[in-house]
Amino acid sequence: MRALLMAGLVFGLATAASAQTADLKVGDQAPNFKLQATDGKTYQLSDFKGKHAVVLAWFPAAFTRGCTIECKSLAENGDKIKMYDMNYFMISVDPIEKNTEFAKATSVTLGQGANAQVVEKKEADFPILSDPTKETAKAYGVLMEQGFATRWTFYIGKDGKILAIDKTVKPATSAEDMAAKLGELKVDPATRP
């Protein structure tokens, strides 16, 4: 019975993910957004058009295992990504207060009791965007039925069009994988400090 319930849950999650894919695909214009970030600024995708590529790394929830590991990878290996002429953001449907606390955390305790594990990480040196209304998540097709975003990364060109969508993000190697994808997509090298 337990196996049947687990199979149902996995199927349900897979179905929810596919049901929420919107119709975005490579070559489509990326939906604009105007969202608050953990650095105190508000970012709008249209502000980057004609200037820089943009990478949006959607994640389910701050302070969870995979999201903490992904943030750690991006904070510790961000120099690999910064070799390219683009701006990158992590983004979730968490409120700005929670994402700000997450960005500043240098250690996160995952699990409870005897199974608790402390993950040490650097403070995020990049903005984390908050989409508490979930409108941007819906526009990008990442909102799950459970109310959180799925872990997908969108690569957006200077022209505002989607260059690639990574639906198989590996949190531990997120920065390295992102840098490799930017190279593969032939995103211009960085010309600014």
For the regions a protein language model found, what residue spans apply to each?
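Residue-level recognition of short loop/turn positions
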Residues: D39-K41, T133, D159
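Structural microenvironment flanking redox-active thiols in thiol-disulfide oxidoreductases
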Residues: T68-K122, K134-K138
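Thiol-/selenol-based redox modules, centered on thioredoxin-like
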Residues: F148-P193
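Short active-site neighborhood of thiol/selenol oxidoreductases, capturing the structured segment around
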Residues: Q44-T68, K72-L74
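Bacterial N-terminal signal peptides
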Residues: L4-A14
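Structural micro-motif
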Residues: E123-P127, E145-F154
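Residue-level structural signal for beta-strand termini and adjacent loop
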Residues: S46-F48, V142, T168
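N-terminal "domain-start" segment that seeds a small globular fold
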Residues: S18-S46
